[in-house]
Curated annotation (Swiss-Prot):
A Pfam family the protein falls into: Ytca
Keywords, sorted A to Z: Cell membrane, Lipoprotein, Membrane, Palmitate, Signal, Transmembrane, Transmembrane helix
Lineage, top ranks: Bacteria, Pseudomonadati, Pseudomonadota, Gammaproteobacteria, Enterobacterales
Protein's recorded name: Uncharacterized protein YtcA
Covalent lipid adducts (S-diacylglycerol cysteine), residues: 27
Lipid attachment residues per UniProt (N-palmitoyl cysteine): 27
Entry's localization field: Cell membrane; Membrane
Species annotation: Shigella sonnei (strain Ss046)
Amino acid sequence: MPTVLSRMAMQLKKTAWIIPVFMVSGCSLSPAIPVIGAYYPSWFFCAIASLILMLITRRVIQRANINLAFVGIIYTALFALYAMLFWLAFF
C-alpha cells in the first residue's frame, strides 16, 4: 500500500508536464495593431479609449455637480480601470 508521500510523488509526476507550459506562456506574439503601415501596441489603443471614456465620465460628474475629494487619485484610478477593462474585453 503506497504511503501518502509516494502517492503525492506519483501525482506530481503526472502533472509535472504543466510547469513548462506556464513558464513559456508569455512567449507569444506581441499584440500589435497595424495602422497606416505602422504597428502600434494594443495597450496604446486601450489607453486612448480609456482616456476618452474617463473624460466622458468626468463630464458627467461635472454636469451632475458632484464634488469629489481626491480628484487626481479618482481619475487616475478610473483611467486604469477603464484601460484594464478594454484590455480584458478586446485583447
